[in-house]
Design a protein with these regions (language model features):
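Short hydrophobic/aromatic beta-strand immediately N-terminal to the Walker A/P-loop
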Residues: 8-12
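Conserved nucleotide-sensing/catalytic segment adjacent to the nucleotide-binding pocket
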Residues: 35-41, 45-106
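Phosphate-binding P-loop
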Residues: 1-6
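The conserved Walker
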Residues: 15
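Post-Walker A alpha-helix
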Residues: 22-23, 27
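C-terminal accessory "lid"/substrate-recognition subdomains
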Residues: 113-124, 143, 155-156, 160-290
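Conserved lysine of the Walker
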Residues: 19
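Loop/turn-to-beta-strand initiation segments
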Residues: 125-129
Length: 290
């Protein structure tokens, strides 16, 4: 059977926003539907490795500026768009890996954590591409995406997550983290938030506890202490005949807040995604074949 195109699904959102929950949900869908997907991490399309980035940040600071991983200057948007375009019509393309830890370097002799592997051609017979990272919905990339999903907590929760992650995993002081948040705010406004107006479906986690001052919060609100607001484009609801009343009945404790929005308990986020997205993925795979 000849392919017409290879579907591309992109999850866009900051690290710690819940994109890992989304990836797990998609892995469940792929397994059940017997779909083979190539997974692309957004980190692999940063322009600089960890060591080069530190040098570039210092160079920008000396000039009175700031460079962050949110910005176009620190990423390979055109290369990512080229991968999506090529894969969409051929099932192939160039990819590489970003090595986060010592464990990940074991397969790559001579490379250290924070470095990239060499570029390589995607090998294997895949049905679709799944992207998870910061920039799946930037204007250069979005035209090639068949299903764009945003995962974004409210901003105070995102800051709490970043502060706790950077303190515990990276050893940064709260003061240093707050300065980084302030310094990259322009890039967040310019490059991150516009993507969520392009998404087909948004998942936004909202804590049900006081997060009014995220810089002194002692704990990250748990899923049990949160609700998830799921907003779907009206075009998506119509195209895939999504029944919000059915979803409300399937997901205990949920309610419809607008004609295109359902609110579910935090622990139900993964299940909600599987119920909503599975028929969309089935349709994308079915219509990709001639």
């Amino acid at each position: 059977m000849r392919r017409k195109k290879y579907p591309i699904v992109a999850i866009t959102g900051s690290s710690g926003a819940g994109t890992s929950t989304v990836k797990t949900a998609f892995e469940h869908i792929m397994l059940r539907e017997n779909i083979k997907a190539v997974f692309i991490e957004g980190d692999s399309f940063h322009k600089y490795d960890r060591f080069e980035m530190k040098k570039k940040v210092n160079e920008y600071k000396k000039k009175g500026g700031y460079l962050s991983h949110y910005s176009k200057e620190a990423n390979l948007f055109e290369d990512l768009a080229e991968l999506f375009k090529t894969f969409k019509f051929t099932g192939k393309g160039k990819r590489r890996y970003y090595l986060h830890s010592e464990e990940e370097t074991e397969k790559w002799e001579g490379l250290k954590p924070g470095q990239f592997t060499p570029w390589e051609e995607i090998s294997g017979d895949y049905d679709m591409l799944f992207y998870e990272g910061l920039h799946g919905g930037v204007e250069e990339v979005a035209p090639y995406v068949d299903l764009l999903i945003g995962v974004v907590p409210i901003i105070n929760l995102e800051w709490i997550q970043k502060i706790h992650r950077d303190r515990t995993a990276r050893g940064y002081s709260t003061e240093a983290i707050v300065q980084a948040i302030k310094a990259r705010m322009d890039d967040y406004v310019d490059y991150i938030t516009p993507q969520f107006s392009r998404t087909d479906i948004n998942f936004q986690r909202v804590p049900m506890v006081d997060t009014s001052n995220p810089f002194i919060a002692r704990d990250v609100p748990t899923a049990d202490e949160s609700l998830v607001v799921i907003r779907m484009k009206k075009e998506i609801i119509k195209k895939y005949d999504i029944d919000l009343t059915y979803l409300k009945n399937m997901l205990e404790g949920s309610f419809i807040s607008r004609r295109n929005t359902i609110v579910v308990p935090g622990p139900k986020m993964g299940l909600a995604m599987e119920i909503i997205v599975t028929p969309i993925i089935q349709h994308l795979i079915k219509t990709s074949e001639l």
